[in-house]
From Swiss-Prot:
One of its GO terms (cellular component) is plasma membrane. The record marks 362 as: Required for activity. Gene3D superfamilies: 2.40.30.20, ATP synthase alpha/beta chain, C-terminal domain, P-loop containing nucleotide triphosphate hydrolases. It is found in: Cell membrane. This is ATP synthase subunit alpha.
């Protein structure tokens, strides 16, 4: 058998053509310093700001400081296994989190890794944690109400879909309870809720998850948690991760509520990172871009125009105050970014007014646009009644002789305070809220003793379920008040059955 040179050369050419190079080109640097959750690396010349990088022990990091001779990297995990001289590798991707329907009902950390012990999250889609907020032309004004189920909020400081409403108050004034009740009330409201817990005890987060599960909320809720024991970079990233997960649904035309509990702890974590990265400190040792930290996050909440699918992302950020001081640095920053604030006051909380909302300092800059027509009609005078009552309350306590009109104002105010009280985790449908506030503002409760008002309200709801379904249905479907004569007759009929306590 003779060997033919042409065949050999043809085979060699074929081999060369089919040869695939296995060489991988990657940008690799060397760790020159590590400690306190921060690493400095030399050699990552082309790394981007905010890019994810990988250390030799598979722990991820994020490039934050791009300096002349080195890169400052925050380590997103335990840093004890990283040492000087270790390799650090670029990924070429800006920091991103997994997104999608499969996250609903899960508890994840800010990197999207499950922490609930229910196995991996099956999703292939990701979104960068930082993205540009929708532009002016991509938005439309907020016009759909987000029903919280809390009378004091839905009547006095209404929240609309796509709004950013700050919840501010001292610790232990019921901020988290307001958020949980709002999430519970979104059942059957076509809403996806994301609860972001920053710097809280793991036991507290477990209690919140348990409460949500008890009320069937996991069917539409994602919990993102960066607990107090986690490294500061994860606390800093948590709200961005939560909003990125929400944006995925908003772009698909769905409605999303993101609760951020709370931004004070995120600001403290960012301050810690900035000081460790040797960025120059400013007021209260916060870095100069602390305002931008929160503004670029909250600007991503929006109500999209119909051309963009009409989805919305509503943000409820929390800020914790010290001794009720809302004029401190972080509170004033966030107040100026958001579309209003709900101020929870510890004095009211301890005096039994719960939710402890200070109606005078709380405001919604969207206002009536975020209320149904019926609520707008009945709740118009409520804020004035409360303000007048708070003013006259001091005089009434001294027992000084008051004229008839003032006495009537004080009596109405006391009943208003009672009606706005609410039990924990018992959100009330808006149609029932409208009817009890109608009864209050039209004077039907004026002859009911103050101590009986809460019982009157509970029994009135039960009576409506039995005998007033047509009234509730009318408000539900038309969003407007039924015929006032029918309403008055119904309330009078119930009052005849109500027994005042002796």
């Amino acid at each position: 058998m003779s060997i033919r040179a042409e065949e050999i050369s043809a085979l060699i050419k074929q081999q060369i053509e089919n040869y695939e190079s296995q060489i991988q080109v990657s940008d690799v640097g060397t760790v020159i310093q590590v400690g306190d959750g921060i690493a400095r690396a030399h050699g990552l010349d082309n790394v981007m700001s905010g890019e994810a990088v990988e250390f030799a022990n598979a722990v991820m990091g994020m490039a934050l400081n791009l300096e002349e001779n080195n890169v400052g990297i925050v380590i997103l995990g335990p840093y004890t296994g990283i040492k000087e001289g270790d390799e650090v590798r670029r990924t070429g991707r800006i920091m991103e989190v997994p997104v999608g329907e499969t996250l609903i009902g899960r508890v994840v950390n800010p990197l999207g890794q499950p922490v609930d012990g229910l196995g991996p999250v099956e999703t292939t889609e990701t979104r960068p944690i930082e993205s540009r907020a929708p532009g002016v032309m991509d938005r439309r004004s907020v016009h759909e109400p987000l029903q919280t189920g809390i009378k004091a909020i839905d009547a006095l400081v209404p929240i609309g879909r796509g709004q950013r409403e700050l919840i501010i108050g001292d610790r232990q004034t019921g901020k988290t309870s307001v958020a949980i009740d709002t999430i519970i009330n979104q059942k059957d409201q076509n809403m996806i809720c994301i609860y972001v817990a920053i710097g809280q005890k793991e036991s507290t987060v477990a209690t919140v998850v348990e409460t949500l599960a008890k009320h069937g909320a996991p069917d539409y809720t994602i919990v993102v948690t960066a607990s107090a024991s986690q490294p500061a970079p994860l606390l800093f990233l948590a709200p961005y991760a939560g909003v990125a997960m929400g944006e995925y649904f908003m772009i698909m035309g769905k409605h999303v509520l993101v609760v951020i509990d709370d931004l004070s702890k995120q600001a403290a974590a960012y301050r810690q990172l900035s000081l460790l990265l040797r960025r120059p400190p400013g007021r209260e040792a916060y870095p100069g871009d602390i305002f931008y930290l929160h503004s670029r996050l909250l600007e991503r909440a929006a109500k999209l125009s119909d051309a963009k699918g009409g989805g919305s992302l509503t943000a409820l950020p929390f800020v914790e105050t010290q001794a009720g001081d809302i004029s401190a640095y972080i509170p004033t920053n966030v107040i100026s970014i958001t579309d209003g604030q709900i101020f929870l006051q510890s004095d009211l909380f301890f005096s039994g007014v719960r939710p402890a909302i200070n109606a005078g300092l709380s405001v919604s800059r969207v206002g009536g646009a975020a209320q149904i027509k019926a609520m707008k009609k009945v709740a118009g005078t409520l804020r004035l009644d409360l303000a007048a009552y708070r003013e006259l309350e001091a005089f009434a306590q001294f027992g000084s002789d008051l004229d008839k009109a003032t006495q009537a104002n004080v009596a109405r105010g006391a009943r208003t305070v009672e009606v706005l009280k609410q039990d924990l985790h018992q959100p009330i449908p808006v149609e029932k809220q409208v009817l009890i506030i109608y009864a209050l503002t039209r004077g039907f409760l004026d002859d009911i003793p103050v101590e009986d008002v809460r019982r009157f309200e509970k029994e009135f709801y039960l009576w409506l379920d039995q005998n007033g379904q047509h009234l509730l249905e009318h408000i539900r479907t038309t969003k407007d008040l039924p015929n006032e004569d029918d309403l008055n007759q119904a309330i009078e009929a119930f009052k005849k059955t109500f027994v005042v306590s002796q």
